[in-house]
Amino acid sequence: LASKLVPPRPAPRLYLATPPVDEPAQLAAELAGLLAAADVAAVLVRLRETDPRGMISYVKALAPAIQTAGAALLIDGQPDIVARAGADGAHLTGVAAMEDAMPALKPDRIVGAGGLATRHDSMAAGEAGADYVLFGEPDAKGQRPSTEAIAERLEWWDELFEPPCVGFATSREEAEAFAAAGADFVLVGDFIWSDPRGAKAALVEIGEAIAQAHAGTFGKAKVEGKAEG
């Protein structure tokens, strides 16, 4: 019997959504500190709808703080400005919007998909080339599935499909549940920025919490063996 020790899968990383951008210089300074303190894989920049030139200037003001920290900069929607703004990709809501954005973004930039209400939608997004799928964000009416339903969807996707899955967490408890369910990334946003202790303390705590929750489920190395001959 030949056996090998398979290392535990890596813990999910943080995906940080910004507040709607009003003061990019102030936000850039804050982001620099946040990204130095916590392991953030990507930042989702949420822009207030304005003219393209204005939105591009906002993204360019934020880009150095994000990209020099080694994080990817994705824009929430607005695929047409991604290349000109120097962003790394875009997050699109719905399969149709994602497919429409593909020509402007592929093959050089990241295309994320959310707004996937059904398993069929999720599979369609994956087949259409999504670089990740997001589960759990609020719909247009502000409603979202239960924590248990989101965790179940993450677990289902993780077991069957290759593209990374992201869990949209609105609390520490959700972040922990999604890490334990097999999320590759945990998206956090408003509850980080509104934390009375400050965003940095909140983000560091969430990073530690998802690492611990992940370790509790996936943290032990496994021995795989097969009979020879």
Language model regions located:
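Conserved N-terminal beta1-alpha1 strand-loop-helix module at the mouth
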Residues: 1-91, 106-131, 162-165, 170-176, ...
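Alpha-helical protein-protein interaction elements
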Residues: 7-9, 149, 185
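Generic structural marker for isolated residues within well-ordered, non-membrane alpha-helices
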Residues: 31, 98, 154
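Extended, folded domain segments that form the structural surfaces/walls around functional sites
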Residues: 53, 135, 151-155, 175-180, ...
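Glycine-rich phosphate-binding active-site loops on the catalytic face of alpha/beta enzymes
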Residues: 94-101, 134-145, 181-206
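CoA-thioester-processing core
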Residues: 101, 141-143, 147-160
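Ligand-binding grooves and catalytic loops that recognize ribose/phosphate and carbohydrate rings
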Residues: 117, 124-128, 132-135, 148-157
